[in-house]
Amino acid sequence: MYSKEMTEVKSRCLGAFVGLAIGDALGAPVEFRRRGMFTPVTGMRAGGTFGLPSGAWTDDTAMALCLADSLLHNPEFDVVDLLERFCDWMLTGTNTSTGKSIGIGQNTLRTLGNYRRTGETTAIKGGKRSDGNGAIMRLAAVPCMHWQNVEKARSIAIAQSQCTHHSPLSEGCCDLMTFILCQLISGKIWEQILPYPNKNNWLEEVSLLSS
């Protein structure tokens, strides 16, 4: 690949990952608040449920950094390494913006606790309790690492979801988002990506997103 093309790819990867953190920091002060109950977000601000300083990120970016660190350690995906990093974040505040883990969801707390007790690396299927967006919020590093091998990226995206959010909806959304990000990183535009045929037996809700 020509150096100019690779520079553009690196820029898109940077945009995907840094954009994740910026969006997280922008939304943190109004997280859990209903639409219309706060002034429009036009810049970084402090406060919110967790009393964070302006520009601070939440558990979503912290876990994204854990996933990125794990993939740098083993690009093929090491589930034990990832879960150990998640536990380190939960217990010691690694990869947080304030030195203390905040915002951990009940589903993630439950599954990491189960891993520490039993060594089980796959979250218990919890129905709608496992349908949260935690797994998709953190996955940017997967397409950034494996955008040239879309099937591998999609497989890892599903596997990392199963660590904490083991449900067809969460896994399908991670699969679809990773496919989209891989295509965008490679230089394709929306019109070349969607609609995408449902080849993976996604739930109807996920299929609607891809149409």
Set out the residue ranges of the language-model regions.
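Structured, active/binding-site neighborhoods that engage oxygen-rich ligands
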Residues: 1-211
